[in-house]
Amino acid sequence: METTVGTLGENTTNTFTDFFSARDGSGAETSPLPFTFSYGDYDMPSDEEEDVTNSRTFFAAKIVIGMALVGIMLVCGIGNFIFITALARYKKLRNLTNLLIANLAISDFLVAIVCCPFEMDYYVVRQLSWEHGHVLCASVNYLRTVSLYVSTNALLAIAIDRYLAIVHPLRPRMKCQTAAGLIFLVWSVSILIAIPAAYFTTETVLVIVESQEKIFCGQIWPVDQQFYYRSYFLLVFGLEFVGPVIAMTLCYARVSRELWFKAVPGFQTEQIRRRLRCRRRTVLGLVCVLSAYVLCWAPFYGFTIVRDFFPSVFVKEKHYLTAFYVVECIAMSNSMINTLCFVTVRNNTSKYLKRILRLQWRASPSGSKASADLDLRTTGIPATEEVDCIRLK
């Protein structure tokens, strides 16, 4: 299911014989997806075309997509559930950075348990055919888009939080009301920006070969609104990729300068050295998260820019759709990296998994305090200095 679609000019009527042709319920042929169109704008040839879903290339891509979706469901579903449960169970884990990570965990968890099963059915089982109705088509696309923007905004908020904590340590930390407002902003901005994704998402019958049809599920913008689509895409590209990446890079560059290249005045006690090592590990982990985010999402945005602003590049490419879905799957896999970095790698999730399976939600009265302290020491999260470096601030 595509989350963005491109646009075509009026002079491209007869250039799509290698793509799917689409038609509405009345039988009027239209321009091929995934480019935007309005029904009846194009007079497509009715030649029988090859079903690309039967090619070896698509078969290989289907295996890759299936493995990625299974990985997302397992890693993001289980890992984020355990982290959210731990955060709800242990109050000492509820600092600002962990709360910001929780927003990212919630969004990835929802995608893993709600969106990925439908996408597995769409991509792998039915091979690019949607059979679940318009409402679910729009809902799944919308939820996945909101999750992407929540993840981006949460990562940006975490970077700013680390910048303020390390570069300006004497400034007071955020109050509960401010933190709640920041979390509300992360979600509200994401929900609002993603509204067009739901509004323009629809189902369209694709005629692959004679007597064979598939139902496309994705965004379809009318040709007469191509200017608005391009403007919307550039807005999203700037607000939810370029801007956050630049801001996060500047924050971590300034933090790195503070931690590695600035001399610490006075005598360095063991406590100070431990805190410095902890902060450096934190920043290295966050830089890895940022690098993974760029490497996973840059190909997706680059592919989309070429498709939407230079459509002739892909017009004659037989395996265009296969390539796009693979790029999209790589982008979605970024949620697994976030989960592994923030939740699994240094969060001792096996202990919490055993407790959940045994329904041991409460510690014994005599040892509750000691148990909570032990849990706090064994659940360090790379991005959270307050947890990794207990009592050092």
Curated annotation (Swiss-Prot):
Widely expressed in peripheral tissues with the highest level in the spleen and moderate levels in the adipose tissues, thymus, lung, kidney, testis, uterus and small intestine. Residues 84-98, 167-179, 254-282, 344-393 are cytoplasmic. PROSITE patterns: G_PROTEIN_RECEP_F1_1, G_PROTEIN_RECEP_F1_2. GO terms for molecular function: G protein-coupled receptor activity; neuropeptide Y receptor activity. Residues 1-62, 120-145, 201-232, 304-322 are extracellular. One of its GO terms (biological process) is negative regulation of apoptotic process. Its main location: membrane. SUPFAM superfamilies: Family A G protein-coupled receptor-like. It comes from the Eukaryota. It is found in: Cell membrane. It is a multi-pass membrane protein. CDD domains: 7tmA_prokineticin-R. GO terms for cellular component: plasma membrane. The chain crosses the membrane at residues 63-83, 99-119, 146-166, 180-200, 233-253, 283-303, 323-343. Glycans are attached at N11. Disulfide bonds join C137-C217. InterPro entries: GPCR_Rhodpsn, GPCR_Rhodpsn_7TM, NPY_rcpt. Belongs to the G-protein coupled receptor 1 family. PANTHER family: G-PROTEIN COUPLED RECEPTOR (PTHR24238), PROKINETICIN RECEPTOR 2 (PTHR24238:SF74). Receptor for prokineticin 1. Exclusively coupled to the G(q) subclass of heteromeric G proteins. Activation leads to mobilization of calcium, stimulation of phosphoinositide turnover and activation of p44/p42 mitogen-activated protein kinase. May play a role during early pregnancy. This is Prokineticin receptor 1. The gene is Prokr1.
